[in-house]
Every structure is written in structure tokens, then in C-alpha cells.
UniProtKB/Swiss-Prot annotation:
Domain of life of the source: Eukaryota
Record GO terms (molecular function): rRNA binding; structural constituent of ribosome
InterPro entries: Ribosomal_uS19, Ribosomal_uS19_bac-type, Ribosomal_uS19_CS, Ribosomal_uS19_SF
Family stated for the protein in its record: Belongs to the universal ribosomal protein uS19 family.
Name by which UniProt lists this protein: Small ribosomal subunit protein uS19c
Keyword flag Chloroplast: yes
HAMAP family the UniProt entry points to: Ribosomal_uS19 (MF_00531)
Signal sequence coordinates: none
Gene3D superfamilies attached to this UniProt entry: 30s Ribosomal Protein S19, Chain A
Pfam families xrefs: Ribosomal_S19
Job of this protein: Protein S19 forms a complex with S13 that binds strongly to the 16S ribosomal RNA.
């Protein structure tokens, strides 16, 4: 279900304050965050945000096409290692 249009998009307070501080100083540096649920807003465009995937922080460069999506969408948490082997030998 989508978020109500009456509400603003969710962005973690600590992340929003870091973005505003960097925009005010016109700096570009990597911002480390664990907040995968934060929505990407237009103020984040051009920044690199390192999003935690459960093991490490993956750097993600924010573009205009990403606005409106969540940060967690761009940091996959699962690694596919292939399907299980056919174990017909053990069944005999």
C-alpha cells in the first residue's frame, strides 16, 4: 500500500540534517547510513550515500531518476548462490 499523499515522504532526521549541511557548504562527500527506509528526495541528487545491506555499506550515487524511491531498493541484501544440486545419488 502506498503512503498517504497528505503525509510527507519519510527521511531519517540524521540523514536529512547531513544532506542539508553538505548542500549549504556545497560539498560532496560519502554519507554513511543504515536507514534503508528513507525516501530519496530532490535535495539528495548528486550525493553519494553508502547504504548498509546487512554486511557492508554500498556506495550509491543519487540521480534524478531515483527520486521517490527508497534507499534500500538500491542495496540488495541477498546474494544468489545458485540452486541446490540434484541429489539423486543420496536417495538410492
Amino acid at each position: 500500500m502506498a503512503r498517504s499523499s497528505k503525509k510527507n515522504p519519510f527521511v531519517a532526521n540524521h540523514l536529512l540534517s547531513k544532506i542539508e549541511k553538505l548542500n549549504k557548504a556545497e560539498e560532496r562527500s560519502i554519507i554513511v547510513t543504515w536507514s534503508r527506509a528513507s525516501t530519496i528526495i530532490f535535495a539528495m541528487v548528486g550525493h553519494t550515500i553508502a547504504v548498509h545491506n546487512g554486511k557492508e555499506h554500498l556506495p550509491i550515487y543519487i540521480t534524478e531518476r531515483m527520486v521517490g524511491h527508497k534507499l534500500g531498493e538500491f542495496a540488495p541484501t541477498l546474494t544468489f548462490r545458485g540452486h541446490a544440486r540434484n541429489d539423486n545419488r543420496s536417495r538410492r
